[in-house]
Structures are given as structure tokens and as C-alpha cells.
Swiss-Prot record:
Organism: Oleidesulfovibrio alaskensis (strain ATCC BAA-1058 / DSM 17464 / G20) (Desulfovibrio alaskensis)
Gene Ontology BP annotations: DNA-templated transcription
Record-given protein name: DNA-directed RNA polymerase subunit beta
Keyword tags: DNA-directed RNA polymerase, Nucleotidyltransferase, Transcription, Transferase
Enzyme Commission number(s): 2.7.7.6
Subunit structure: The RNAP catalytic core consists of 2 alpha, 1 beta, 1 beta' and 1 omega subunit. When a sigma factor is associated with the core the holoenzyme is formed, which can initiate transcription.
Gene (name only): rpoB
Reaction catalysis annotation: RNA(n) + a ribonucleoside 5'-triphosphate = RNA(n+1) + diphosphate
Top-level EC class: transferase
CDD domains per record: RNA_pol_B_RPB2 (cd00653)
GO molecular function, one term: ribonucleoside binding
Cellular component, GO annotation: DNA-directed RNA polymerase complex
Length: 1375
């Protein structure tokens, strides 16, 4: 029975939160096409192979074709990979076919001569664990999803910032997934230029001509034509067209056939007069003789008599040209329709700049611009141009690029992944329209223009890069050798692919060491989106806009959770309900609204699809029929928040928490916190260290169970079933249904104990179930670190008082009770791993041994006979963990050694002590030792002991597994055999004992103690015997499989290890360090209220309540108002009310009140129909147990943006008998005197963060020095010193502390001889300081020497102690 929980949420959530790791797991499954019946040819790994193969040689005499691939089973399981430092990967085999052709020299036709098919080992591929991580070289890593600009087309303008005229210049860019970028932009003179791959710009019409268009074609595409007629009487007539209306002034009266004037001279044409003229059948109207002067020709004008071109298309019409056309009897003049239209003459102006005449010249010009160093020929230029945008091998828009291009340009005709002529021309038409109408530019920060590249796609791209490298090598190999004699494996070498994968998983910016501090940090890391990485932004170039919160982020990207440093806004998190669709766009779910009624139909929409929808908020009030109560509803339309009539609403949010990430959704009363503090709160929860005893928060949000369930830290039941065995080491479950058919539905879960996480925190699981318990799918079987009862539990519920206390909580410092140290409230366990390797050196092998020269017995007391520390030993800094000796080179023998050799006649062992010792700052208990030996090497006693222990564990596991299978089989057979007549009698275990006679029926009691094997052929009924036999055959097969499985595990234990070359033996020692709460530790709440422990006060000195109970923690009240995180105060009040109410209910039981009244009180407190029915259905024993669990407080759930109101909190406080202002009288623990003012007190959830003082504190007297400057090194890792910078020097100079300064800058730093003398003087007790020359001065002198300046020290005559630095130049002069 779960704990009774008070839920304050009012909004009914109709959709469960999707699995939090779906993005990672589904993406990699799609890449491998796991579970697919047939492989899709253009997806994942199959698509990569098909895109590179077939590979042909340069002469087309042979072709290497891909057939299929197969992924094998991994050699080691995940636990072995982590323990041995290996990569969790599976082998890949590909089937390829080598086809050799005979080529006819004349016709160039090919005929197949030979086909060879072969299976080839193609290296390995890292596999993803079920937790969404990769194990690379023994460490768990996460591939972070990249957020990058989507392929497609984007229209932009410079907002008038580029040119001094402040003219707005428009541009557009076509971005492919792979290939050349294409940019079109206008300059201030309205000339359209094109850039390919951001090279030198050129007139865009060159590109149009290269596509095969003539001048006339270009003009015809972009402009409409008007026609004018040159009459013999000198008049100029304008031919009417219904599409070419222009508000021009009529030159002469225009009358219809009946003489009625439609348009008067001197008056402008109206749309009505234009329509009447067309209806009257008037073909043309007269215009002024010079009307077309200044317009542009739409076509070439040719004198038909002579064939002479009088004027070319796009030429400007002049009065002289009009006269010439009349002379040549040209009647009809085609003109571009630019006058009075929205279309400018920019394309025509660009054509005039373009000096190329035809397609060939245009292509040569493009080649010359992009390849300036190589001489162009028409053929090369033509091939080059075709490859630029039209060849799928070099250019790929990708399905998403094509989708975005079609969506933006309104195209539906093509699904090609290359760029077509229609795409380019339509893009220019849209760009022209934007420029001519001053339309808005696209928003590049809109999530419709940014897409997620999940892990599957990132790995796919890397695999493709590797295969392309391999393709080059294969082609070269095919051309160098006689292909007909080769087999496919002679051509294929998978090393380039493996190298690319290794580099990506090991060193890529997106492959990160997993943050494993706690369960939340793991999940958050896998849901992170990064705009950095290859192909993304850099933090230096990223501006404010790309980092800022955008309206399209709502429900897709969390506006709160992001780092505080230089990466702010570049690294973000997915929201709780967000999904990524097949195109990589983030989608969020909405409920569909029809005719003002909210339905349960759910629609996932990306940011582009949401455009135009009217979306109501999740907290909009609904009546019983799910209709909006208010006439006007708060909605979002195109990013703006407006009040809309309820009839216009089309969608509604699913839940108030859908706009924030899981970290932010764990902050109760988030709506009352300032965003900056909420950001800190969500980030600091990820740094919380799992404590020795986890406690879930009294005030939660309801998200805790979702995070714990999906984190992978807990063990979750995969189906309904029964627990067969449970202890601290393992849980054995038999599942119903078809799960694990080879083991009869039985699965054994190993619980992890004292396992080291990536951040050295302790990863341990504890069982929640007991033997014989019936479980349901999704039940939590075992809690992980920082989890209690399947809910996230990162901190502790502490009684808090907001008051100053003697300055100890000045500036966010924290005063805490000694009870937290005594009772291990904030104690955590950290595990440190130390490794030692014995190698084969040139001077001989290193040896792990107990026999170490010049080491006393007390240092060896915890080492065993093999020189390795025993498990359970308490160690402190400088203790030996593993004894190791290394051979030394030949040295000069001392007289003593010569004497020894003369006496004993042998060389004394010449070795040095290189043992593994405990480093400074580590004090703890050895909890595990792992030894790794070469397969062929001899095993020492400790290795044999470890192996024996492991084998005994495996034997026990196998017995438990088989026992569970036997019980399951017996239960499955019970309905078949119980009540059936026996054909034979049943003998008992003891001699002469008879359980049942022949002819009796078998009872359930008899079956219980009976070995299942004895049921074979036991019954009179043939059908029963057949059913039993069938079940027993299946049982035997399953036992056989379990035996084989454990046998292979035993072999792995005893077979030895694959060690790197030159390594004889390796040992790893794990030390558990207990870190108690200490002054200097960083602590925080969930609202960004962080601080450092300044004082741990004895319990009796802490402020206390009137009944004598002391508070646990004292915080500064001044930390609240300026930070504006009022959520912490509301949490404090609700926590106090919940704690007191729970205590009150538990006391009612203890004081002997009758259960009926306690039940009624519980129902009143929870005020929930669901809880009331649950309480009514409980038997007395369960009810008493449930109420006793409330002693420490009633667990409450107050979801973000839908939590408890102030009125509800006040009501609860009144019920608990507390003042509704949340204040109480406190007494000083030191004097017993009551404080003057009442103090805000309550219960707050406090976390201990990973910044522990024990790990940061560091001291040094002497240690390593830098080789060049001879100054001490810096940092704890190098055992370095404290840096005294120039500002510190200024401070000492200001105080005139000359001797102190001299000491700091010489003997305590880089005066080599001085510090040796200093040491001698300290030993002798002489306190006189004699400073010498700092080594850094010598470094300066040497640097000056490198500039040709010789610095020497002179002694002046007549002055003994005075020294002066002088400089001697190359010509002998000095000063």
C-alpha cells in the first residue's frame, strides 16, 4: 500500500508524460532499425551503406556492391565493460558482392564476367544501453542532441544596417544538409547577386543562364508583358489586358461602340472604366507618343527585312529607338510590365551587368569564380556546375530540407533531394515579392527553422564520413591491382570507419562524460539540446537573439533551465511532454477544441504547424461538459498572448507543466519564484549528492516518481508477476506472459552495491519487495541512489527558522544543528578508484609484491601475501594500497653494498618502491579490489581467492534462478494435475514413508513438497500425462539454457583478461569515503536559495519552540526579498502545516483514540474522494500502519502553475493549530530567553551539493616546482601552492610589509638556493632570513639574451656590497 498523499492539483491531466529517455533510445533504435521486419533502404545504417555502395573503379571494369549487414552479440556485458575499461560494442558483418565486367572497347557495353559474394567482418559499433548511454573505454558517456539551423530556405533582411542610406536589403539562403550553400542578396542599387559557398558574388542572372535560360526566358519568367502598337498615323496604342490594370491618366477620350465615353482625357483610369473598356471589346487605347520612353523591351526586336537586331531584350526604350522602329516598319513592341506595378526592374538591371552571352560562358564564369586557380574548359565547367546542385552524390537537401523548401515556397511538385531550376526561380520570385512589398523576414530563431539532430543522426553522419574515406581507398586499390584475382575482403578495410567512430565517441564536443551525480542529473543530461558542436554555433559568435527565450519555445524548450555561464541559452532542455518528430522538429501536445468543447483527442504540433492556431492555457476554466466557462479565454496566437472569444479557440494545453523541463517541474511553487532564481534552483538540484538515507520531500510536485521511474536508477517490473527471491544482492522474478521464454519467464536482477558513479558518488540499490509478493507492470522493485519508494529524494526535510543569529548567517551563510552531523542526516558516501599497473620495462618486469625495500612492517600490516590491501581496511593518506617494485638501472655500489656482495656472493636486489599510495585528502574504507591478469600469466593467491568468491556467487545465483523456475513450473502445472488420479503410489523422503497410494487424487499439499520431475507419467489420464510431459520438456530446455548461461559466466571469471601490450598485471582498489556535513559545504533549497555552512551549532544552543523542540537550520531572512523567490516561503508554510498535521494524526493513534474518529479526521484533512474511498477500503492494521507513516509529515504534491493557493495553505495551517502568518515564538537555546519578535518557521527541503569542502581543502609546505620558473605548481591535483598575484603584492606594498613581501617572493617561491638554506635554518632553529636571487629574474635575463641584450651584474669600485645590473650591447657599449 502506497503512502497517503495530498494532491493540490486541480487540472486533470489526460496524457501521461512520455518516457523521458525516448529521444535517445528511439533515435539509436531507428539508426540500427532494431525490431524492424524489413530494413528501410534509405534509413539508418542501411541507408548509409546504400548511399556509398556500389563502388566502381575508374574504368568501370569492376563494381563492389553492398547486399546486407548483420550486427552480432556483444562479447562483454555492460558491467564487465565498466569494470575492465572496455567499450560496450557489437561486431558488424557485411555481405558484399564483387562484380567484374568485360568492357567492349568499341561500344563501351559491359558484360558480367564474374561475381564473388562474401561475408566480411566490418569492425564494431558501440551499442546504447537501455538507459540511453554509451560505455566507451569503461566510462558511461552521453551523446548530447544538437540543435542546429534546419536545412531549407531562409529569407532575411539587414534592417537597414548595412548601407549608409539605411535602405533595407533583402537576401535569401538555401541551406542543404550536404553540399554548397546558395545565397542571393540585393545591394543598395537593387542589383541581385548570387554567392555559392560564400565565395565572391556575381550577378544572379549568370546562374539563370548556366541553368539554360536565355535573356528573354529570364525576363519572361519574372515579368509580365505589355504590348504597344506603332500606328502609321503616328499614334501609340496600348493593348488592353485584364491583368495589367494601371491607374494611369487617359491621354484621349475612350468611347464604346455607341459613342458613349467610358474614360475622359486627363482623368485616371478606374477599375470600373477598365472593366467597361474590356467588356466593350476595345482592343487598345491611345497613349502619349513618348509614353514608353524609359520602359524596357521584353524581347529582341529584329528587322525582318534585313535580319538585323535593332534592340535586345531588357534594353531601355528611347525616343530615338521609337523613331527607328517606325522607320523599319515595326508595328508591335513588347515591353516589360514594371510601370505602376509591384514588380521592380531589379532583374532587368542585373541582366545589364551580366556580360555572359550563353549557357557555356555562364558555366565557365561560375567555374572561374569558384576555382580561380585551375584553367576552365567548357566540359569541365559544365560537369562542375551539374555536380554543384544537381548531383545527389555531392548535394543533398535531405527530406527535411525538401519539406521546409516546399513549405516556404508553396511547392508541391517535387520530392527530389537535389535543387531544381523551379526551386531557384521560385525562391527569387518570393524574394522579389518580399523586397518590392517590404515584407517581413523569416525568424531564424523560430523553432520551425531550427531542428534537433539526435544521436542516431549524428552517428549516421560519422559512419557516412568513414565510409566515404574507405570508398577512396577501395577505388585506388581497384585501379592498382588486377581486380579479377581479388576477393571482396582484399578490397575492404574497415579501419577508416572505426577511426572516425572512435574519434566521435571519444573526443567529439557532443560526446560527453555523463553527469551521474544523481538520477535527475542523468536524465537531464540525456534530454539536453546543445547549439554548440560541429556544424553548430560557437559561444563567442552566438549573439543575444539566438540565446534568448522565443515564443515558439513554449511547450518545446524550457525557458528556465540553462547554464549560467558563457553557454547561457546555447544549452537548453526539452520540456516534459516534448517529442522530436521524424524531421527533427520539436513537437508539443495539445487537446483539440471543437465548437468550444475541449475533447480528449491529442494532437502533437511542431512550431510551424502551430502558426495560426488559437491555443488556450491549461488552466482555462471548464464546466462539467468540458466547455469554457468564461466568454473570453486567455490564448496564444502567433506568439502573442491575447483574450479570444471561446468559439475561436482551436487547441488547449495538456498540462501547466508542459512549458518547463523536468528539473524546473520539480520546484514547488515555481510560479512564485523569480526566473533567475528558478534557473539556479533547477541547475542545483542536478548537483545534489545522494545521501546515506534518502528522504522524499514533504512538499513535492508529483514529477518525482516520473523522474525516478525513467532514470534507469531503479529496477522496474517489466510485466505482471511474482517475486521468487529477494535480498540485498538480487531479486528473482517470474513474469507472466511471453517475456523471457528461454528461462521460463524468470529474470534475475543483480542489485548494484557500492558502485562508483562517474562523479564518484555512491550508486547503490535497495530492494522494496519481498519474497512471494505479487507485482504489477511498472512497479518499482528496487530504489536507486537518491530515491525513496520510487520517488526522487535528493535532500532532507528540515525545520527551518528565518532569523539572524550572531552574524553566522550573514550573506547567505547557513547555521545548522549538530543533530544533522550526529544522526548522519547529510552524510554521503563517495567512492574513489585507484589503479596500479605492473609493466614489462627495459630493465625487467615490475612486480606487485609485499616485499618492498625500506618499508616498515606497520606500513604493510593491511597488505596480504600478494602485496594487495585487504577489503575492510581503514586507510588514510600515504598508506600503501598495492605494493609494487620497479627495477632500477645499474648504479655505483656503495662500500657497504660491496662488502655485502663480497660476503654473500650475490647482487642485492636493485629495485625502487613505486607502490600505490592513498593520496592526500582521502580517508576511508577499502570496499573492493579487482585484479586483472594476462590470460597466460600465473595467478597469485589473491586472484584465486577473488575467483573462488565470484564462482560461489554465480553458483548461488544459478541455484536461485533454477529454484524460481521450478516454483513457476510447479504453479503452472498445479491447475493441470491437482485433483487427478495417480497411476502409482508416491513414496516420501524417509524410508518406508508413503505420501499417497495408487488411485488417490493428488492434492495441492502433496504437490508442494514433490520434485516436478516425479510428475512425469504419474497419472491415469493420458491427456494429463501428455500436458505434464510437454511442460517438463520445456522445463528441461530452460534449465539447460540457464546452465549454459552461467557456465559461460564462470568461464569469463577464470579465463584471464585482455590487457594492453606490455602490461603484466593491473589492480584497481575502491575506497569508500564517508563525508559528513562540515563547515564550508555548500547547501541549497530548490528555489535558488544557496549558501555555505558557516557554523555547526550544538543542538542545545539552537533556537527552540515553546515545547522544547529545536530547529534544524537557521537562514537569513534578508536572502528572500531581494531574490524574489517567495516560493521558498510558501514551501516552508505548507511543509510546516503538513508536518504538524501528520504528527497530530499519529498522536491521535498513540493517545488511544478510536479508529473510526481517526479515519474521519484523515478524510477531513485530505478532503479527496479518492483518499476517502482508499481509507474506507483499508483494514485496521493497514490503516494504522499508513497513519504511523504520517508521523514525519503528510507528503503533499503541488504541481507547478497548478499548486496550492494561499487560502489552502492558511486553511491547512489553521487545521494543524498553527498561526496563519506562519510565524511562531522561538527561544534562544543559549539563554532560554524568548526572542523579541515572532519568527517565520516551517519545513523546507534542503539539498547538500557536490561542492564539498573536504574535496576542495588543500595545504602544502613543500612540493613540486615548475621546471623553468622554479615556482610552485598550482592546483590541488598538482599538490601546488597558493598563488600570490600582482594585486596581493599591491596590498602588501600598501601596508609596507617589506619583509613579508621579500619572503613571499623569494624563499617561499623561486629562490632555489635560498629555500634550501631556509630549510636548514628552520631545522637548526635559526630564524634569520637570507634571501637570494629569484629564478624568474634569471628567466627574464635569458629572454633578454634571446633579444640580443646581455645582462650582467657589476660591482662598483669602492662599494663592497652594492650591486648594480648593467646591460652590454653587441657593439660593446654599456650603461
Amino acid at each position: 500500500m502506497g503512502q497517503l498523499t495530498k494532491k493540490f492539483g486541480k487540472i486533470e491531466v489526460t496524457l501521461p508524460i512520455p518516457h523521458l529517455l525516448n529521444l535517445q533510445v528511439d533515435s539509436y533504435k531507428k539508426f540500427l532499425q532494431e525490431g524492424a521486419a524489413a530494413l528501410a533502404p534509405d534509413e539508418g545504417l542501411e541507408g548509409v551503406f546504400r548511399s556509398v555502395f556500389p563502388i566502381e573503379d575508374f574504368n568501370r571494369t569492376a563494381s563492389l556492391e553492398y547486399v546486407s549487414y548483420e550486427i552480432g552479440e556483444p562479447k562483454y556485458d555492460q558491467a564487465e565493460c565498466i569494470s575492465k575499461g572496455l567499450t560496450y560494442e557489437a561486431p558488424i558483418r557485411i555481405k558484399v558482392r564483387l562484380v567484374v565486367y568485360d568492357v567492349d572497347e568499341d561500344s563501351e557495353n559491359r558484360t558480367i564476367r564474374d561475381i564473388k559474394e562474401q561475408d566480411i567482418y566490418f569492425g564494431t559499433l558501440p551499442l546504447m544501453t537501455e538507459k540511453g548511454t554509451f560505455i566507451i573505454n569503461g566510462t558511461e558517456r552521453v551523446i548530447v542532441n544538437q540543435l542546429q539551423r534546419s536545412p531549407g530556405i531562409i529569407f532575411e533582411h539587414d534592417a537597414g544596417k548595412t548601407h549608409s542610406s539605411r535602405k533595407v536589403l533583402y537576401s535569401c539562403r538555401v541551406i542543404p544538409m550536404r553540399g554548397s550553400w546558395l545565397d542571393f542578396d540585393y545591394d543598395h542599387k537593387d542589383i541581385l547577386y548570387v554567392r555559392i559557398d560564400r565565395r565572391r558574388k556575381m550577378p544572379a542572372t549568370i546562374l539563370f543562364k548556366a541553368m539554360g535560360m536565355s535573356r528573354s526566358d529570364i525576363l519572361e519568367y519574372f515579368y509580365k508583358k505589355e504590348y504597344y502598337t506603332l500606328e502609321d498615323d503616328g499614334r501609340l496604342m496600348w493593348e488592353l489586358d485584364k491583368d495589367l490594370y494601371r491607374k494611369d491618366v487617359a491621354y484621349a477620350d475612350v468611347a464604346d461602340g455607341e459613342g458613349k465615353v467610358i474614360a475622359k482625357a486627363g482623368k485616371p483610369y478606374t477599375k470600373r472604366s477598365w472593366r467597361l473598356m474590356l467588356e466593350a471589346g476595345i482592343p487598345a487605347v491611345e497613349v502619349a507618343p513618348d509614353y514608353i520612353a524609359g520602359m524596357f523591351l521584353a524581347e529582341d526586336i529584329v528587322d525582318e527585312a534585313t535580319g538585323e537586331v535593332l534592340a535586345e531584350a531588357a534594353d531601355e526604350i528611347t525616343l530615338d529607338l521609337i523613331d527607328r522602329l517606325r522607320e523599319c516598319s515595326i508595328k508591335r513592341v513588347p515591353v516589360l510590365h514594371t510601370k505602376g506595378s509591384d514588380t521592380s526592374s531589379s532583374i532587368r538591371d542585373t541582366l545589364l551587368l551580366d556580360k555572359t552571352a550563353d549557357q557555356e560562358q555562364a558555366r565557365v564564369e561560375i567555374y572561374r569564380r569558384l576555382r580561380p586557380s585551375s584553367p576552365p574548359t567548357p566540359e569541365i565547367a559544365s560537369t562542375f556546375f551539374e555536380n554543384l546542385f544537381r548531383n545527389p552524390d555531392y548535394y543533398d537537401l535531405s527530406p527535411v530540407g525538401r519539406y521546409k523548401l516546399n513549405q516556404r515556397l508553396g511547392l508541391t511538385t517535387t520530392q527530389e533531394r537535389v535543387l531544381t531550376d523551379e526551386d531557384i526561380l521560385t525562391a527569387i520570385r518570393v524574394l522579389n515579392h518580399l523586397k518590392d512589398t517590404h515584407g517581413p523576414a523569416d525568424d531564424i530563431d523560430h523553432l520551425g527553422n531550427r531542428r534537433v539532430r539526435p544521436v542516431g543522426e549524428l552517428v549516421e553522419n560519422q559512419y557516412r564520413i568513414g565510409l566515404v574515406r574507405m570508398e577512396r581507398a577501395i577505388k585506388e586499390r581497384m585501379s592498382l591491382q588486377e581486380v579479377s584475382t581479388l576477393m571482396p575482403h582484399d578490397l575492404i578495410n574497415p579501419k577508416p570507419v572505426q577511426a572516425v567512430l572512435k574519434e566521435f565517441f571519444g573526443t567529439s564536443q557532443l560526446s560527453q562524460f555523463m553527469d551521474q551525480t544523481n538520477a535527475l542529473s542523468e536524465v537531464t543530461h540525456k534530454r539536453r539540446l546543445s547549439a554548440l558542436g560541429p556544424g553548430g554555433l560557437t559561444r563567442e559568435r552566438a549573439g543575444f537573439e539566438v540565446r534568448d527565450v522565443h515564443t515558439s519555445h513554449y511547450g518545446r524548450i524550457c525557458p528556465i533551465e540553462t547554464p549560467e555561464g558563457p553557454n547561457i541559452g546555447l544549452i537548453v532542455s526539452l520540456t516534459t511532454y516534448a517529442k522530436v518528430n521524424d524531421f527533427g522538429f520539436i513537437e508539443t501536445p495539445y487537446r483539440v477544441v471543437r465548437d468550444g468543447q475541449v475533447t480528449d483527442e491529442v494532437k502533437y504540433l511542431d512550431a510551424s504547424s502551430e502558426h495560426g492556431e488559437v491555443v488556450a492555457q491549461a488552466n482555462a476554466r471548464l464546466d462539467g461538459d468540458h466547455r469554457f466557462v468564461d466568454e473570453f479565454v486567455t490564448t496564444r496566437v502567433r506568439g502573442d498572448v491575447i483574450m479570444s472569444p471561446r468559439e475561436e479557440v482551436t487547441l488547449m494545453d495538456i498540462s501547466p507543466s508542459q512549458m518547463v523541463s523536468i528539473s524546473a517541474a520539480l520546484i514547488p511553487f515555481l510560479e512564485h519564484d523569480d526566473a533567475n532564481r528558478a534557473l539556479m534552483g533547477s541547475n542545483m538540484q542536478r548537483q545534489a549528492v545522494p545521501l546515506l538515507r534518502s528522504t522524499k520531500p514533504i512538499v513535492g510536485t508529483g514529477m518525482e516518481a516520473d523522474v525516478a521511474r525513467d532514470s534507469g536508477a531503479c529496477i522496474i517490473a517489466e510485466a505482471d508477476g511474482v517475486v521468487r527471491y529477494a535480498d540485498a544482492d538480487r531479486i528473482v522474478v517470474s513474469y507472466e506472459g511471453d517475456l523471457y521464454p528461454r528461462t521460463g519467464g524468470v529474470r534475475s536482477y543483480d542489485l548494484q552495491k557500492y558502485h562508483k558513479s562517474n562523479q564518484s558518488s555512491c550508486f547503490g540499490q535497495k530492494p522494496l519487495v519481498s519474497r512471494g509478493q505479487v507485482i504489477r507492470k511498472g512497479d518499482v522493485l528496487a530504489d536507486g541512489p537518491g530515491i525513496e519508494d520510487g520517488e526522487l529524494a535528493l535532500g532532507k526535510n528540515l525545520v527551518v527558522a528565518f532569523m539572524p543569529w550572531c552574524g553566522y548567517n550573514f550573506e547567505d551563510s547557513i547555521l545548522i544543528s549538530e543533530r544533522c552531523v550526529k544522526e548522519d542526516v547529510f552524510t554521503s558516501v563517495h567512492i574513489e578508484e585507484f589503479e596500479v599497473v605492473a609493466r614489462d620495462t627495459k630493465l625487467g618486469p615490475e612486480e606487485i609484491t609485499r616485499d618492498i625495500p625500506n618499508v616498515g612492517e606497520d606500513m604493510l600490516r593491511n597488505l596480504d601475501g600478494s602485496g594487495i590491501i585487504r577489503i575492510g581496511a581503514n586507510v588514510k593518506p600515504d598508506d600503501i594500497l598495492v605494493g609494487k617494485i620497479t627495477p632500477k638501472g645499474e648504479t655505483q655500489l656503495t662500500p657497504e653494498e660491496k662488502l655485502l656482495r663480497a660476503i654473500f656472493g650475490e647482487k642485492a636486489r636493485d629495485v625502487k618502491n613505486t607502490s600505490l599510495k592513498v593520496p592526500p585528502g582521502i580517508e576511508g574504507t577499502v570496499i573492493d579490489v579487482k585484479l586483472f591478469n594476462r590470460r597466460s600469466g600465473e595467478k597469485d593467491e589473491r586472484t584465486r581467492n577473488i575467483e573462488d568468491y565470484e564462482l560461489a556467487r554465480l553458483d548461488q545465483k544459478e541455484k536461485d534462478h533454477i529454484r524460481a523456475l521450478t516454483e513457476t513450473t510447479r504453479e503452472k502445472l498445479a491447475p493441470v494435475v491437482v485433483g487427478k488420479q495417480l497411476a502409482y503410489g508416491l513414496a516420501g523422503q524417509k524410508k518406508g514413508e508413503v505420501i499417497a497410494e495408487a488411485g488417490q487424487t493428488l492434492t495441492a499439499e502433496m504437490l508442494e513438497g514433490l520434485p516436478v520431475k516425479k510428475l512425469s507419467g504419474l497419472f491415469k489420464s493420458k491427456d494429463t500425462n501428455e500436458a505434464v510431459q510437454q511442460a517438463l520438456e520445456s522445463y528441461d530446455r530452460q534449465i539447460e539454457f540457464i546452465n549454459a548461461m552461467y557456465e559461460s559466466k564462470r568461464e569469463k571469471v577464470t579465463e584471464g583478461d585482455d590487457l594492453p601490450p606490455g602490461v603484466i598485471k593491473m589492480a584497481k582498489v575502491h575506497i569508500a569515503v564517508k563525508r559528513k556535513l562540515n563547515v564550508g559545504d555548500k547547501m541549497a533549497g530548490r528555489h535558488g536559495n544557496k549558501g555555505v555552512v558557516s557554523c555547526i551549532l550544538p543542538q542545545e544552543d539552537m533556537p527552540f519552540f515553546a515545547d522544547g523542540r529545536p530547529v534544524d537550520i537557521v537562514l537569513n531572512p534578508l536572502g528572500v526579498p531581494s531574490r524574489m523567490n517567495i516560493g521558498q516561503i510558501m514551501e516552508t508554510h505548507l511543509g510546516w502545516a503538513a508536518k504538524e498535521m501528520g504528527r497530530k494524526l499519529a498522536l491521535m493513534l498513540e493517545h488511544g483514540q478510536d479508529l473510526a474518529s481517526v479515519r474521519e479526521q484523515v478524510k477531513t484533512v485530505f478532503a479527496s474522494d479518492a483518499i476517502s474511498s482508499e481509507v474506507d477500503n483499508m483494514d485496521d492494521e493497514t490503516f494504522v500502519r499508513s497513519v504511523r507513516r504520517l508521523r514525519d509529515g503528510i507528503v503533499t504534491k503541488t504541481p507547478v502553475f497548478d499548486g496550492a493557493t494561499e487560502e489552502q495553505i492558511w486553511s491547512w495551517m489553521e487545521q494543524a493549530g498553527l498561526a496563519n502568518d506562519g510565524k511562531t515564538e522561538l527561544y534562544d537555546g543559549r539563554t532560554g530567553v524568548r526572542f523579541h519578535n515572532r519568527v517565520t518557521t516551517g519545513v523546507m527541503y534542503i539539498l547538500k551539493l557536490h561542492h564539498l569542502v573536504d574535496e576542495k581543502i588543500h595545504a602544502r609546505s613543500t612540493g613540486p616546482y615548475s621546471l623553468v620558473t622554479q615556482q610552485p605548481l598550482g592546483g590541488k591535483a598538482q599538490f601546488g601552492g597558493q598563488r600570490l598575484g600582482e594585486m596581493e603584492v599591491w596590498a602588501l606594498e600598501a601596508y609596507g610589509a617589506a619583509y613579508l613581501l621579500q619572503e613571499f617572493l623569494t624563499v617561499k617561491s623561486d629562490d632555489v638556493t635560498g629555500r634550501v638554506k631556509m630549510y636548514e635554518k628552520v631545522v637548526k632553529g635559526d630564524n634569520f632570513l637570507e634571501a637570494g636571487l629569484p629564478e624568474s629574474f634569471n628567466v627574464l635575463v635569458k629572454e633578454l639574451m634571446s633579444l640580443g641584450l646581455d645582462v650582467t651584474l657589476h660591482q662598483e669600485e669602492g662599494k663592497k656590497r652594492t650591486k648594480r645590473a648593467g646591460m652590454t650591447f653587441g657593439d660593446g657599449t654599456s650603461y
